[in-house]
């Protein structure tokens, strides 16, 4: 009897969360283990591509965000500037990884590409749950100084891992919504 009532309670909770017609805001996702899951998947993709040599070159160089963090500069930025940098980086990574879908890829590589694109979309959803501003494209078309060009798929996935471990983690760890209960 308890098993059935527990399952029923779980079903009621799920239905409550997914009830159509309610426009309730997303609950903040402050647990960094969520990001750790995405980092692990990105790391798995990078590890799989490490052994790839000739088959992993990219026809044209792609632009990706720089992953190094100058902590003095980062701490001096307000949350909107930090959010814009992370959202911009996620946008660049999504564009770069998405550009790989055009070429003929192995099934393994294609699965890593698809997973990475889904993960970036999920990370954006996590940021949205934390009321972090969406990506706003820059008004000038000048080349951003916070970017680099890369020429291999393994480099791309390495940048993806490092970006998530660095700037994305810093932003999530210090999101104002998550710090409200901390004194």
From Swiss-Prot:
The record's listing under Pfam families reads: EPO_TPO
Give the chief site where it resides: secreted
What biological process terms from GO does the record include?
A: erythrocyte maturation; hemopoiesis; nucleate erythrocyte development; pronephros development; response to activity
Q: Name one GO cellular component term.
A: extracellular space
PTM comment, free text: N-glycosylated.
Gene Ontology molecular function terms on file: cytokine activity; erythropoietin receptor binding; hormone activity
Q: Where in the cell is it found?
A: Secreted
The record lists its disulfide bonds as 30-178, 52-56
Residues annotated as glycosylated are 61, 104
Q: Which UniProt keywords apply?
A: Disulfide bond, Erythrocyte maturation, Glycoprotein, Hormone, Secreted, Signal
SUPFAM superfamilies per UniProt:
4-helical cytokines
What Gene3D superfamilies does the record point to?
Answer: 1.20.1250.10
| Signal peptide limits | 1-23
Among InterPro entries, the record links this protein to: 4_helix_cytokine-like_core (IPR009079), EPO_TPO (IPR001323), Erythroptn (IPR003013)
Tissue expression as described in the entry: Expressed in heart and liver.
Q: Does the keyword Disulfide bond apply?
A: yes
Function of the molecule: Erythropoietin is the principal hormone involved in the regulation of erythrocyte differentiation and the maintenance of a physiological level of circulating erythrocyte mass.
Q: Return the similarity comment.
A: Belongs to the EPO/TPO family.
What's the name of the protein?
A: Erythropoietin
Q: Which organism is it from?
A: Danio rerio (Zebrafish)
Q: What gene name does this entry carry?
A: epo
């Amino acid at each position: 009897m308890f098993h059935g009532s527990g399952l029923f309670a779980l079903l009621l909770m799920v239905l409550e969360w997914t009830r159509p017609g309610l426009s309730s805001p997303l609950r903040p996702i402050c647990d960094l283990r969520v990001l750790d899951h995405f980092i692990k998947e990105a790391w798995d993709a990078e590890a799989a591509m490490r052994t790839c040599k000739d088959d992993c070159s990219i026809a044209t160089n792609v632009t990706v965000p720089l992953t190094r963090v100058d902590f003095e500069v980062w701490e001096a930025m307000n949350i909107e500037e930090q959010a814009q940098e992370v959202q911009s980086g996620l946008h660049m990574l999504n564009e770069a990884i998405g550009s790989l879908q055009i070429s003929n890829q192995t099934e393994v590589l294609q699965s890593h590409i698809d997973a990475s694109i889904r993960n970036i979309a999920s990370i954006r959803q996590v940021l949205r749950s934390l009321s972090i501003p969406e990506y706003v494209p820059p008004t000038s078309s000048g080349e951003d100084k916070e970017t680099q060009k890369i020429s291999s798929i393994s480099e791309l996935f390495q940048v993806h891992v490092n970006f998530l471990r660095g700037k994305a983690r810093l932003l999530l760890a210090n999101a104002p919504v998550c710090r409200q209960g901390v004194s």
